[in-house]
Amino acid sequence: MNTKILETLEFNKIKDLFQGSLQTEQGKLELQVLQPTTKKEAIERAFLEVTDMEQILVEDPHFHLAATKDITAISKRLELDGDLNIEELLVLKKVLRVSHDLVTFYNDLENVRLQELNRIFENLVDFPAIQGSLLAVNDGGFIESFASEELGRIRRKIQENESKVRDLLQEILKNKGDMLADQVVASRNGRNVLPVKNTYRNRIPGVVHDISASGTTIYIEPRAVVNLNEEISNYKADERYELLRILQELSAMIRPHAAEIANNAWIIGHLDLVMAKLAFMRERGAVVPAISDTQAIQLLQVRHPLIQNAVANDLHFGPDLTEIVITGPNTGGKTIMLKTLGLAQIMAQSGLPILADKGSRVGIFSQIFADIGDEQSIEQSLSTFSSHMTNIVSILEQVDSESLVLLDELGAGTDPQEGAALAIAILEDLRLRQIKTMATTHYPELKAYGIETDWVENASMEFDTDSLRPTYRFMQGVPGRSNAFEIARRLGLSEVIVSHAQEQTNTDSDVNQIIERLEEQTLESRKRLDNIREVEQENLKFNRALKKLYNEFNREKETELNKARLEAQEIVDLALSESESILKNLHAKSSLKPHEIIEAKAQLKKLAPETVDLSKNKVLKQAKKNRAPKVGDDILVTSYGQRGTLVKLLKDGRWEAQVGLIKMTLEEQEFNLLKAEKEQQPKRKQVNVVKRANTAGPRARLDLRGKRYEEAMKELDEFIDQALLNNMAQVDIIHGIGTGVIREGVNKYLRRNKHVKSFGYAPQNAGGSGATIVIFK
């Protein structure tokens, strides 16, 4: 698309309307380079993305994106084998965090059928390992001591020596306070010094770092702390080196994935732009138009997006119409209508929603050309006519049948008779070349051209003769007429003079009377159309009510299906329960190892279909409410599908339960009473429901803090085996930070264990790098 039309129609100002809704720098960059396209598939994809986002926000109104920065320069540095600084790592950390949140959101998204955004979401790549490593850099830009064992050791040494220095200085302050100018420890040149009175400078041996302006105070670093301060300086140099090494290590870890992370950043920005489009639709009442295959345009209640409270108009530019000529006096809104058509096309071809009603349709044009306004060049001393004609000559040389042409005040700026003749000739040339054109003019001769010529239609802007003001309503099919006589009469001009003037233009008066009747018919048609729109709105309300009833019916149907699934599940559960019993007997009577038991269980479970989620079943919920739990009751932990026994009711209302070899603390809603189920179904066997859930629930924990390495590894092996035997989906291992030996041992063990799906550090508020969360397959 030529840039001149974008400037003429102020497309950059249109983009600014979306700017305020954007959260990401990448989204702002994408909007900045956005241009109209002629590829129908690309436009339809852009519109489908907006429709998809609308569905997502209906399902989850709280879905949002966090602000992220552009990582183009960061990616370039990584490609050139450069190392990143802390600020750049924080930018990447934010991008990875948002990427992870989006992946999680998409995986959990239900009840939404996406047509385009699924492709976008599925291209996101999650990097849990890199995210875990970047936890070492906190959001304040500080590299935590657990980033490496060496860094932790260095910082402990610095703290120890600084503590010794403080103790020594405090002792000197206490014992030799009378020799000091002030009872404080000062700092000079990065060293801790004491303000010693000049008269006692030889009584406190050390290094002089500064002298006060008056010469009465000497700032001395006592000899007793010089060596310690030297050690501190050396350790701080080591710290800087280690921090640099950590940054290099993190950069090396990220470098192979730079392209994928950059793609993640683009996706985040793209989703941000899609959300901005949807926000514009909701705030301004915009719509996504249909795309025509025949360049047919139908704009319903279209408005100019840059004009506050713009009058809405209908415009029909069908395939059987080549030109629309808007005639009539100036100041009626003809130019605005011209620009409104151009902007609607440019916005739609850029994948942006347009200010119109549903049912609107746009074409696809390879180029849009316009000659609008007075663009004469003072430097070239061109007249208004010459300026317009220069533009029109250029347009006529470039246009083809795939173009849209907008001409404002065609033929103006010269002799009216010659100007009208030129205007008709130019329009005829465009018509014969089948180039869609909308033109405005105040020459009455063009009314006849519009009436007599095929594929051409007249139009005008409505004028209220009562208020003597333009209404800015577009009247398609009705030529414009002069209201000079009526205006003069209402302003008080003598009736004799007005009548005499009308006698001089009898022919024009007849034409004006015909136009007046056409205007009346158009107004009547508009009223009927308004009534039709009201009926359509009522139908929409009725359709929404029907849809609501349909959804309620589906929910009831799902309830009945769940009951059927429950009965089927009980049969499966019985088989699984019997297999559990067999395996336990084998384990008790033979020398099978725990991991062999786990393998056997896994093979048996493959024989059964996937379990259904009964946690939301109304029948079970009602059964649970029939009796309050008490100590000794058998229970089923819903999140893990494990049987247990209630041991004690705690003060806070939670229950302590024995589940296998593990004790758990449970909320009442986290388990079902098995005895209550027995009372209702005395003839049925009680069974275990084997289920793993991703939702939050009770967890088994192993605390290895304070253990020796060999002892900790043995306990870890036994604990993991027991957790697998008990069908745990997730466990927590607390190893602390310490020297990192136990933590590294845990990581190595988990990496080797084929039953572990994934593991990573806990959130900061749940132990951070001092605890590891393990998720089983």
UniProtKB/Swiss-Prot annotation:
One Pfam family cited in the UniProt record for this chain: Smr
E.C. number(s) listed in UniProt: 3.1.-.-, 3.6.4.-
Chain residues that bind ATP: 328-335
SUPFAM superfamilies reported for this sequence: DNA repair protein MutS, domain III (SSF48334), P-loop containing nucleoside triphosphate hydrolases (SSF52540), SMR domain-like (SSF160443)
Protein name: Endonuclease MutS2
Domain (Smr): residue spans on this chain: 702-777
Domain of life, per lineage: Bacteria
Family: Belongs to the DNA mismatch repair MutS family. MutS2 subfamily.
Gene3D superfamilies cross-referenced by the UniProt entry: 3.30.1370.110, P-loop containing nucleotide triphosphate hydrolases
A GO term, aspect molecular function: endonuclease activity
SMART domains from the UniProt entry: MUTSac, MUTSd, SMR
Keywords, alphabetical: ATP-binding, DNA-binding, Endonuclease, Hydrolase, Nuclease, Nucleotide-binding, RNA-binding, rRNA-binding
Subunit details: Homodimer. Binds to stalled ribosomes, contacting rRNA.
GO biological process: mismatch repair; negative regulation of DNA recombination; rescue of stalled ribosome
PROSITE patterns reported for this sequence: DNA_MISMATCH_REPAIR_2, SMR
Gene: mutS2
UniProt entry tagged with the keyword Nucleotide-binding: yes
Biological role: Endonuclease that is involved in the suppression of homologous recombination and thus may have a key role in the control of bacterial genetic diversity. Acts as a ribosome collision sensor, splitting the ribosome into its 2 subunits. Detects stalled/collided 70S ribosomes which it binds and splits by an ATP-hydrolysis driven conformational change. Acts upstream of the ribosome quality control system (RQC), a ribosome-associated complex that mediates the extraction of incompletely synthesized nascent chains from stalled ribosomes and their subsequent degradation. Probably generates substrates for RQC.
InterPro entries cross-referenced by the UniProt entry: DNA_mismatch_repair_MutS_C, DNA_mismatch_repair_MutS_core, DNA_mismatch_repair_MutS_sf, MSSS, MutS, MutS2, P-loop_NTPase, Smr_dom
